[in-house]
Amino acid sequence: MNTRLPEILCACVIASPLIARGADEDRFSMEDYYKVDKVDAHFHLNTKDRNFVELAVEDRFRFVNIVVDSAGEIALRHRHQSTLALHAARPDRVAAASAFSLKGWDGPDWDAKTIRHLDATFAKGAVAVKIWKNIGMVFRDKDGELVMVDHPKFDPVFAHLQKEGIRVIGHLGEPKNCWLPLEQMTVNNDRNYFRKHAEYHMFKHPDMPSYEEQIAARDRMLEKNPKLHFIGAHFASLEWSTDELGKFLDRFPNASVDTAARIGQLQYQSERDREKVIAFLHKYQDRILYGTDFSMASDAKPEDAHARARKRWLADWKYFNTDAEMAVPELDDPVRGLALPKSVVEKIYHRNAVRLFPGSWKK
């Protein structure tokens, strides 16, 4: 007979609050949101106005402010002007990512002109380059052929970026839902987006490259540039499967991914296998950047934009840091938070961005 059983039981009762407190101390709370330095590594502030950035100081957020070639050459020029001006005004809060135009693609010197343009943006402080889904999904050459990201004409540009150590943020392809009918899509935000943007709903365009062809073109480009620091925007368009994301990150050791506009797909998976998603985030904690894909137009009121951004930021913080059950707009059913340890959250929200964009956010 174990005469120490009452003593052991008593010790367990006394220790259990201490164990619980220790677990809580290893995780951030909702109150910690305003105490922890954070980077939104996928943001679009299309304005020279500093007010939004000043409002976000209370949230302890800094930004990678990204230019996108989505509206023509004139808009691209204006976006560069505002993005670089905002960086110059608040280099301690805003890092800049530039982009390039495909205008003049069929000319013999497109690559040289593009490199000169990008170098000019780097001289003004840009630390990364964004490539967008118009490559592979929209832009065609003079013969009417879609230009994929592994086209040889891009080779000198990517080789230059690789040599200079410039990060490339790539939104290539779309979420896998894009190739499914609306009723089969897994999350509401994809369903709503492709209902409004039928031109990108590839299920309706069977003559266009498949999802697999888009991913393969991206991977061939990375194989040609093994030392390129590539950040796969939107979970590298592999948002539907942590297994596939893991394979991608294992295959390309210089690649990272951001969470922008795809946390709903992560929640869809954690709703079905929470522990698997937690294990993925633990294993690849050094390769994941928090981002939202939030966009603020030049004519938007900073206070209104900040209120919308904070709502998103707080919801994501709750998901990653607590084990509370919550309603999210991307899903019809509630999802339980992941309650990640502080060490993992600090990397996803801050340390990885500081490491990947060296020299950023300094006065």
Which stretches of residues belong to each language-model region?
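Hydrophobic h-region of N-terminal signal peptides that target proteins for export
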Residues: 11-21
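An N-terminally biased module of ancient metal coordination in phosphate/nucleic-acid-related enzymes
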Residues: 22-93, 112-113
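Generic structural signal for hydrophobic
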Residues: 55-56, 86, 121, 161, ...
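Active-site gating/metal-coordination segments in enzymes
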Residues: 25-31, 81-202, 206-209, 256, ...
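Acidic-and-aromatic substrate-binding clefts and catalytic sites of carbohydrate-active enzymes
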Residues: 42-50, 69-79, 103-112, 139, ...
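Bacterial N-terminal signal peptides that target proteins for export
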Residues: 1-9
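H/E-rich (His + Asp/Glu) clusters that bind or coordinate divalent metals
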Residues: 23, 206, 210-220, 225-363
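Hydrophobic faces of well-ordered beta-strands that scaffold small-molecule active sites
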Residues: 39-43, 63-66, 94-98, 129-131, ...
